[in-house]
Design a protein with these regions (language model features):
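Single conserved position on a long alpha-helix in the C-terminal lobe of the eukaryotic protein kinase
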Residues: 1, 115-224
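Generic recognition of flexible, low-complexity loop/linker segments
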Residues: 24-28, 64-68, 109-113, 120-128, ...
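A mature extracytoplasmic/lumenal domain signature
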Residues: 42-44, 83, 127, 144, ...
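Juxtamembrane segments of multi-pass membrane proteins
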Residues: 93-94
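Extended amphipathic, helix-rich lipid-handling scaffolds
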Residues: 99-114, 225-237
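Non-transmembrane, amphipathic alpha-helical segments
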Residues: 105-109, 177, 213, 272
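Extended, charge-rich low-complexity interaction segments
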Residues: 105-110, 188-206, 249-265
Length: 277
C-alpha cells in the first residue's frame, strides 16, 4: 500500500474517481554504449484513468523543434513540448487546484492565453550566478497577440503588489517590472517570448552560432511530445559551481566527480511511453 503521506502528494490534481494504485507503470532498463536508458509505459484497466490519459494525449502534439536555434548549446536545462492550447486548458480546467487558483474574474483572460498556444513551447535556464536571479528564456508558437494585449489592458485586475507594474515598450512588447527583476515579454512573428535578461530580450528572434541543434541530445528530441534535458557538463562549468567545489570540501568534490561522468540527463514522452537517459 502507498503510505498516506505520499498518497496525498501523488493524488494532488487527480479527479476523485482516480486512485494512484489504479495506474501501473511498466519499465525496462537498457544499458547501451555510453548510455543508460529507462523506458516506462502506463497501464490501467480503470476507465476514468484511460479517459484522463486520452485527454492528456490530445493536449499535446509532436514537437517541430521550432525554437532550438535560439538557445545556446550550453543551456543548463531545456524543456520542449508540443502544445494544443485549447485542449490543455480544458484538461487543466478539470483540475481542482487550477480552478481554485484562477478566479472567475481572470478565467476568460487565462483561457484566451492558453487557447493562443498552437505548437512548440520551449524554455531554457541559460545561466546561474551569485549576484542575480537565474537567467531564463522562453518561446511559444501562438495564433496571435490578442491575449497579451488583453492582459496589459486589464493589468489593474491582476492584483499586482506595490512596486510591480506592466509597461508597454512598443507594439506587442511589454515588461513586467518588480523590485527584484524585470521580465520582458511579447510577440514577434507569431512567436511569444519571455526572458528576464535585457541582452537576450534585445536579441529575440536571432539564431545563435552554436545552438541546441548541435547539442548531443538534439537527435533524441525528434518526434517527442515532451522533452527535457539537463546539461551536466555546462552546469559543472559554471563559475559558481566551480567555487562551491573549490571551497565546499570533500563532499562537494565527490559529487562533482560523480557528475563529471555524465554528459547530460534527458527525460522525454511520446504518447503513453516515457524515456529517461
Amino acid at each position: 500500500a502507498i503510505p498516506s503521506t505520499y498518497r496525498s502528494q501523488i493524488s494532488m490534481g487527480l479527479p476523485s474517481e482516480i486512485k494512484p494504485e489504479d495506474i501501473t507503470i511498466l519499465g525496462g532498463l537498457n544499458f547501451e554504449k555510453g548510455k543508460i536508458a529507462l523506458k516506462t509505459e502506463n497501464y490501467t484497466e480503470n476507465d476514468a484513468v484511460k479517459a484522463l490519459l486520452k485527454k492528456q494525449m490530445e493536449s499535446f502534439g509532436k514537437t517541430n523543434g521550432t525554437f532550438v536555434k535560439y538557445f545556446p548549446a550550453s543551456t543548463l536545462m531545456f524543456i520542449n513540448m508540443g502544445v494544443k492550447g485549447d485542449g490543455l486548458y480544458n484538461l487543466l480546467s478539470e483540475n481542482k487546484e487550477f480552478r481554485s487558483t484562477v478566479s472567475i474574474a481572470k478565467a476568460d483572460e487565462v483561457k484566451e492565453l492558453f487557447n493562443s498556444f498552437n505548437g512548440d513551447i520551449s524554455a531554457g535556464l541559460i545561466n546561474v550566478t551569485m549576484n542575480s536571479a537565474p537567467t531564463f528564456l522562453a518561446y511559444a508558437d501562438v495564433k496571435n497577440g490578442n491575449a497579451l494585449e488583453a492582459l496589459y489592458k486589464n493589468k489593474q485586475s491582476l492584483g499586482m503588489r506595490k512596486g510591480e507594474d506592466i509597461m508597454e515598450l512598443g507594439k506587442d512588447e511589454y515588461v513586467y517590472k518588480t523590485r527584484g527583476m524585470n521580465i520582458f515579454f511579447g510577440i514577434k512573428d507569431k512567436q511569444m517570448y519571455a526572458t528576464n535578461d535585457e541582452l537576450l530580450y534585445k536579441s529575440i528572434g536571432k539564431t545563435v552560432d552554436k545552438s541546441i541543434k548541435d547539442a548531443p541530445y538534439a537527435a533524441d528530441m525528434k518526434g517527442k511530445t515532451v522533452f527535457m534535458a539537463i546539461n551536466a557538463e555546462a552546469i559543472l562549468d559554471l563559475p559558481v559551481v566551480k567555487m562551491l567545489v573549490g571551497f565546499g570540501g570533500k563532499e562537494f568534490k565527490t559529487y562533482s566527480d560523480l557528475a563529471s561522468k555524465v554528459s547530460y540527463l534527458s527525460v522525454s514522452s511520446e504518447g503513453e511511453t516515457s524515456e529517461t537517459d
